[in-house]
Amino acid sequence: MAQFYSAKRRVTTRQIITVKVNDLDSFGQGVARHNGKALFIPGLLPEESAEVIITEDKKQFARARVSRRLNDSPERETPRCPHFGVCGGCQQQHVGIDLQQRSKSAALARLMKHEVNDIIAGAPWGYRRRARLSLNCPPDKPLQMGFRKAGSSDIVNVEQCPVLAPQLAALLPRIRACLASLHGTRHLGHVELVQAGSGTLMILRHTAPLSAADKEKLERFSHSEGLSLFLAPFSEILETVSGEAPWYDSHGLRLAFSPRDFIQVNEAVNQQMVARALEWLDVRAEDRVLDLFCGMGNFTLPLATRAASVVGVEGVPALVEKGRENAIRNGLHNVTFFHENLEEDVTKQPWAKNGFDKVLLDPARAGATGVMRHIIKLKPIRIVYVSCNPATLARDSEALVNAGYEVTRLAMLDMFPHTGHLESMVLFERM
């Protein structure tokens, strides 16, 4: 009879070892060396020694947790948030901001095989102008409102959040009190807060109809707090209760948006990012510029203030329409927006027949692997690639380098201080 054996699991002895950390990865984990391989230890910083317990032992690397820290790095900070270490929102509040930026820049430089020329950053606290807080009301218990625990669907009841814009952070206890007073608390899903140029927005998701009394209470609350309130009974429906249509500023232009539309979370970094893109592209009065994955025009419209003509291309029809409206609202008549499948050959479209001098693209995390060959066909002089995923950026960059482009500028965008998120932008020039 045949006998079957399962593969042996690599068993760790759980022994305590003493190590010294010599590096910090972009996720805020300390990196030491043990048995000839990298050992990742959350919570430790470079120059710190600790007694640690191995929790995972792989062929190429291992992981450990701290049993006892033996000394403190001069770059260690006291976390400002009482929920740090439990809430999944921030991972690096114990790390000095300079060290955070250096470690992210080093990780980006390794991936791109190019030095980081610029760090684009704003204030490390109070920067987040958008947040979604989960809501839950267990039977016979108070309403829970907060963010998810790290690695869990459980909610951390958040009383304060130092990375939120101050206007939003100040609202948290009053929003909690208002929502807890409703009769339909068990039907509340989440609340989104946005600090726009037009003021504060509150979007309340609920899974069953709210009573007239609850709606009236919410409307009174919105008026007393001076915020715009929107109800979302279903995923595709948005009901305006109070307030005006929101807008935000991009390089001196006013961009209207729907409360659910994507806008960059960090306003200060977004403003610098747009300005740097214009500078790197060296947009001139005679240029034709193409903006791919353009959204509602965050880059497109500022580009149109300098270029002869700009084409914005986006895969979401509602954002294309919003871009057109924003162009009209800002008196820009040299910009056109088109809805296209960006995986298809955009060079065959009528609007591309005259070519483009400069190209900007700002894709989602999946990157733009299907788009690169079409960009190469256009033979632009300069390309700026804005990325929220350094791995896909490095992959897509290879296509441009192989086609004769060279990385001439690389910037790390510190869009999300105290987290492991790493964003960047690159300038490619045709050689």
Curated annotation (Swiss-Prot):
Catalyses which reaction? Answer: uridine(1939) in 23S rRNA + S-adenosyl-L-methionine = 5-methyluridine(1939) in 23S rRNA + S-adenosyl-L-homocysteine + H(+)
Positions of the catalytic residues: 388 (nucleophile)
Note the SUPFAM superfamilies from the entry. Answer: Nucleic acid-binding proteins, S-adenosyl-L-methionine-dependent methyltransferases
Q: What class of enzyme is it?
A: transferase
Q: Which domain of life is it from?
A: Bacteria
Q: Where [4Fe-4S] cluster is bound, by residue?
A: 81, 87, 90, 161
Keywords (A to Z) from UniProt? 4Fe-4S, Iron, Iron-sulfur, Metal-binding, Methyltransferase, rRNA processing, S-adenosyl-L-methionine, Transferase
* Keyword Methyltransferase set for record: yes
Ranges for domain TRAM come to 10-68
EC number(s): the record gives 2.1.1.190
Q: Tell me a Gene Ontology molecular-function term this record carries.
A: rRNA (uridine-C5-)-methyltransferase activity
Q: Where does S-adenosyl-L-methionine bind?
A: 264, 293, 298, 314, 341, 362
PROSITE patterns reported in the protein's UniProt record:
SAM_MT_RNA_M5U, TRAM, TRMA_1, TRMA_2
Tell me, what is an example of a GO biological process annotation in this record? rRNA base methylation
Q: Which family does it belong to?
A: Belongs to the class I-like SAM-binding methyltransferase superfamily. RNA M5U methyltransferase family. RlmD subfamily.
What does the UniProt function comment say about this protein? Catalyzes the formation of 5-methyl-uridine at position 1939 (m5U1939) in 23S rRNA.
Q: What is this protein called?
A: 23S rRNA (uracil(1939)-C(5))-methyltransferase RlmD
Organism of origin: Salmonella paratyphi A (strain ATCC 9150 / SARB42)
Q: Which gene encodes it?
A: rlmD
